[in-house]
């Protein structure tokens, strides 16, 4: 008998974590093991959203330490929009002129913790969307308790060139359809399992 050996090439799926803040102090002691576990599970690339100037050095240092795996975003998180938000935005703009980033983020609106700076958050969101269009970068949107307003603002800027993801989406089907109509993706996380999730 002649045996024919068949070689089946199995390609391992490459996974990308589109949103992880691995540069925060909580990971400082075991970042190497975190990266090894991610690789063991097929997660080869990790996208790092910016928060504000207080974490910027840690963000960029992690990217420098793991240049084949970690890719930095640049932006001002809506929960960091406070009294000094204009200086923070100036820093974001300055960094965008210095080097390329994978995306503009984490930007958007956050009404869950504090509603003191809603108008300033909206101003910062609009401005950073303009920069995303200028630099032809996707945006990563924080929309906790603010999905309708985020959709409205994105819609005003959407002329076919704006794209990105609504991070940690937990709203209802109607909002999901509007987001898809805008050509955007949704990040689905554990929040979707909460009782008050709209899906």
Where do the PLM segments sit?
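Mid-domain alpha/beta scaffold segments of enzyme catalytic cores
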Residues: 3-199
């Amino acid at each position: 008998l002649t045996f024919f050996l068949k070689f089946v090439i199995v390609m391992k799926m490459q996974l990308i974590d589109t949103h992880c803040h691995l540069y925060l102090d909580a990971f400082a002691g075991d970042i190497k093991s975190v990266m090894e576990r991610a690789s063991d599970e097929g997660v080869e690339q990790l996208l790092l959203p910016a928060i504000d100037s207080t974490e910027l050095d840690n963000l960029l240092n992690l990217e420098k330490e793991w240049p084949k795996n970690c890719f930095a975003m640049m932006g001002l998180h809506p929960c960091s929009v406070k009294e000094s938000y204009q200086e923070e935005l100036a820093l974001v703009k300055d960094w965008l002129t210095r080097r390329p980033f994978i995306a503009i983020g984490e930007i958007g609106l956050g009404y869950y913790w504090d509603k003191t700076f809603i108008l300033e958050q909206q101003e910062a969101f609009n401005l950073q969307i303009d920069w995303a269009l200028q630099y032809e970068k996707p945006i990563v949107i924080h929309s906790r308790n603010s999905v309708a307003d985020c959709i409205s603002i994105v819609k005003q800027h959407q002329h076919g060139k704006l794209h990105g993801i609504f991070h940690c989406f937990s709203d209802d089907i109607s909002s999901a359809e509007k987001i898809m109509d805008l050509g955007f993706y949704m990040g689905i996380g554990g929040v979707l399992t909460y009782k008050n999730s709209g899906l």
